[in-house]
Amino acid sequence: DIKKGDKVITYHIEKDEQGRYHESHITSTIECVIRTKCENNKETMVQLGNLLITPYHPIIDMVNYEKEWSFPIKRGTSREHKCNYMYTFVTSNRQSLVIERYIFATFGHGLKENIVSHDYFGTESIINDLKKFPTYEEGYVNLTKNMIHRDENGLVSKIE
């Protein structure tokens, strides 16, 4: 199990003005593990190898040497899977995790590229909301779906 303080491999990619990609893999530290309870112990997910992921959680496919963010739903079929919890992470440097040969966007990532950009998940706003939970400093936050609030467009905008 991944926990606060664990060292993980993170990934960063930037595209310069000439369209060239600059990539780096570095070691980062897990700041917090976010565990969201699946309703009725099931969730709609896409299976990519051994990775089960929600259909719209941005990834980069390292298996096929891709450089652009995409949604898992473009790579596989979404279906209901039995699962008790979904896990998301906050890294100390806010960089993306490497999981099962996929790059996995973390909360507060600050990325502005197409697909991965998000006004809440990609900013410190989500980190600030998570820090309000008394267990954040211990390295974990347990959520239920009713703690996740959406705006008028259906996008997640607050957790409390």
Language-model features, listed with the residues they occupy:
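HINT/intein-family self-processing domains that catalyze protein splicing or autoproteolytic maturation
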Residues: 1-160
